[in-house]
Amino acid sequence: AGMQFKEGSVVRTISKGQNVLGKATITEAFEKDFVIYDLNRFLSLHSSLSDPEIVINSDTNNLTIKSGTSKTTYGLADESMIIAPPAKEIKVENAEVNFRLTKDDMNQVLKLSGILGLPNIAVVGDGSEISISALDVKNDESDNFSIKVGETASNFKMIFNTENLKMVPGTYDVSISSKGISHFKHATDQIEYWIATEAGSKYEG
């Protein structure tokens, strides 16, 4: 997937399906806007170099990446070639479901979903507890795994695609709205995600 970098220290990206938006504030600030067409390719290059220094060349629409005595020229893309995130911030207001998801609980549910081959993760309220479960919503007889993460007086089932919850590891404060959008805010780093819930999600109150 491609990624747009804006002038400043805030980086925002959106998934190809436009159902996951990520935002992070980084320590370095970019002097100019630029677009990378294949982010994984660029990150692989960046990680293979020792202490790389990046110079943005707007006139030739490329980057010069210096590392020791080596120099790499890396071509940039046009904004029209990628799916750019919306300029407007997403707000999740009056979210009905709120809880803290610890790093250990998140890691465990993702690990078990992988071992059991389960395509969905659901946040479920049964009128007393909130649990996060790995399951297959299309198969009632599938294996499932769940962990209690909070308490609630409400009944709901908010469904996510497991792939959409593969985020930067950490503890997150989670808010989920019955309108189909959730907000995951990292507890210690300046990282946030907005993730759409899947069809079949319901909030009964």
Feature locations, PLM:
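DNA polymerase processivity clamps
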Residues: A1-L76, A95-G205
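Long, charge-dense
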Residues: A77-F99
